[in-house]
From Swiss-Prot:
Name of this protein: 2,3-bisphosphoglycerate-dependent phosphoglycerate mutase
GO BP term, example: gluconeogenesis
One annotated GO molecular function: phosphoglycerate mutase activity
List of residues binding substrate: 8-15, 21-22, 60, 87-90, 98, 114-115, 183-184
Protein task: Catalyzes the interconversion of 2-phosphoglycerate and 3-phosphoglycerate.
Organism taxonomic ancestry: Bacteria, Pseudomonadati, Bacteroidota, Bacteroidia, Bacteroidales
SMART domains: PGAM
Top-level taxon of the source organism: Bacteria
Species of origin: Bacteroides fragilis (strain ATCC 25285 / DSM 2151 / CCUG 4856 / JCM 11019 / LMG 10263 / NCTC 9343 / Onslow / VPI 2553 / EN-2)
Length: 248
């Protein structure tokens, strides 16, 4: 039996403030650190021993991974970071409060911007200081590949080459792999693994720092998937995520 665990990062400062974050490199809150530590303890209690871990270039995911591995006493395992695992780029929405934006444009429009499969928010201009081409961490990425905005479809197209060529093939030699990333980048992986339709994927709400386990046969066929934790608590957390983009 082979396993891949997908984990969304713990609560970030802009999660707490209900802002569109995207590629903005905000830190974890104290609650987010505690969530990450709890996830690590839960994984350890359930006997997970990872062979390798993957994460994005954004500190909220990197620090979540560090907390998890520390609590599991597995700090030594190989870790690979990739910009391809970054969150969906929210264009010029980045930094705006979701509820205030919903009050201005309506819940339906904000839901489209947040979760539509193929509609992206307005793009950042080339001279916008938030444009990733100005950041040192992306210097080795061709400028044409760096997004100024993304739909979920765009995000999945960015992630899938890395998933198909790097992460998933490693399951041939590894027994357990951990991927710590973001709500939309993980949504893309889940859509691929479970063959979820474009229409249904927008309804999937991933809570912060709740391990999502995928079990595969030795032939790498998906056999089972489940969240680790109390089902009722997880349901409430999912509901809270769904309500983030609604006006108050």
């Amino acid at each position: 039996m082979k396993k891949i665990v997908l984990l969304r990062h713990g609560e970030s400062a802009w999660n707490k403030e209900n802002r569109f974050t995207g590629w903005t490199d905000v830190d974890l809150t104290e609650k987010g650190i505690a969530e990450a530590c709890k996830a690590g303890e839960l994984l350890k209690e359930n006997g997970f021993n990872f062979d390798k871990a993957y994460t994005s270039y954004l500190k909220r995911a990197v620090k979540t991974l560090n907390c998890v591995l520390d609590r599991m006493d597995q700090d030594w395992i190989p870790v690979e970071k990739s910009w391809r695992l970054n969150e969906k780029h929210y264009g010029d929405l980045q930094g705006l409060n979701k509820s205030e934006t919903a009050a201005k444009y309506g819940d339906e429009q904000v839901l489209i911007w947040r979760r539509s499969y193929d509609i992206a928010p307005n793009a950042l201009s080339e001279d916008d200081p938030r444009n990733p081409r100005f950041e040192n961490r992306y210097q080795e990425v061709p400028d044409a590949e760096l997004p100024r905005t993304e739909s979920l479809k765009d995000t999945i197209e960015r992630i899938m080459p890395y998933w198909k060529c790097i992460i998933f093939p490693n399951l041939k030699t590894a027994d357990e792999i951990l991927v710590v990333a973001h709500g939309n980048s993980l949504r893309g992986i889940i859509k691929h693994l479970k063959h979820i339709s474009d229409e249904e994927i927008v309804k999937l709400n991933l809570p912060t720092a709740v391990p999502y386990v995928f079990e595969f046969s030795d032939e790498l066929n998906l056999e089972k998937d489940y969240f680790l934790g109390d089902p009722e608590e997880i349901r409430k957390l999912m509901e809270a995520v769904a309500n983030q983009g609604k006006k108050k």
